[in-house]
Amino acid sequence: MRRAEIERETKETYVKIALNLDGEGSFLGDFPIPYYKHLISTLCFYAGWDVEINAKGDIEVDPHHLIEDTGITLGKAFNSAILKSSFLRFSNKVIPMDEALVMVVVDISGRPYLEIKDDKEILKGRLIKEFLRGFVNNSQMTLHIWILSGENLHHVEEAIFKALGLALGEASKEVSNLKSTKGKIW
């Protein structure tokens, strides 16, 4: 089974995540920031992952620490679980949500890189970037996000998490042979 359990504790946060890549898309647990709980559970639902999370932190100071550390912990769990198999590796998805249209492209490559094309600067200063950066760097994947249109911030961010979930669900599917001209990724 492609599962992992990762725990991260700092002076500012505590995050424990149990991840099953071959799940049903269920999200259990406690995350004290409702909007980000919504986004993370959306990602897991569309990826088909079962995730149990226990997270707490100094959100009265700033939610930044907890959101970033959750991305880091989920990325580490994903990396640990995905290495237990060969997988499709690549995927891309274009998802609308009302006026928002977002394209996500992933390569589970062993090379972390995050590119967000946001010409209108819709995500400027948003903590979603910290979550995604932590996730990408620790999952060791390449992630490109293009915001093609959108005005409502919630619609844009939710479209990103839906597209990312669908793309990761597909890219992480088990296959008999990993596609790499090098013969391996890590």
UniProtKB/Swiss-Prot annotation:
Its EC number is 4.2.1.19. Pfam families: IGPD. GO terms for cellular component: cytoplasm. Signal peptide: none annotated. It catalyses: D-erythro-1-(imidazol-4-yl)glycerol 3-phosphate = 3-(imidazol-4-yl)-2-oxopropyl phosphate + H2O. Keywords: Amino-acid biosynthesis, Cytoplasm, Histidine biosynthesis, Lyase. Pathway: Amino-acid biosynthesis; L-histidine biosynthesis; L-histidine from 5-phospho-alpha-D-ribose 1-diphosphate: step 6/9. GO terms for biological process: L-histidine biosynthetic process. GO terms for molecular function: imidazoleglycerol-phosphate dehydratase activity. Its main location: cytoplasm. HAMAP family: HisB. Belongs to the imidazoleglycerol-phosphate dehydratase family. This is Imidazoleglycerol-phosphate dehydratase. It comes from Dictyoglomus thermophilum (strain ATCC 35947 / DSM 3960 / H-6-12). The gene is hisB.
